[in-house]
Amino acid sequence: MTLVKKAIPVIALVALAACQTMSDAGSTVGGWFSSGKTANVKLTGAEQNPPVATSATGSGSFTLATDGAVKGSVTTTGVQGTAAHIHRGAKGQNGGVAVGLTKNGDTYSVPDGAKLNEADQAAFKAGNLYVNVHSAANKGGEIRAQLLP
């Protein structure tokens, strides 16, 4: 048996193993979850409840993996943010904090290892979570966006 004939079964097994690893739920590609639901967001003052007159804006995305892990961030312009959170609440409703975001300059990110509980996972999938950025002038939030996967 030649070396090439001996190598073919080994190469085939390695290729099959790689395919299985790539298809596993919750695997990551480039730091993002390869399965789950993603919500892209555009934050404005008009989305706040009550609405806020501001020129500040923000954008970003959040991804929920099938195991409840959540990742994502928003980047803002025109606001001196003091805090940002993912909150529970349908459009036009205010609610409690589900996840606090960490600030780095004008970017607010979900902390590593953050997970949503089952109720918050269902709320995410139903569009009943929102992200907002608070400021000294608008303690309840200056800009907001609904998470709509």
How would you label these PLM feature ranges?
Residues 1-19:
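Sec-dependent bacterial lipoprotein signal peptides
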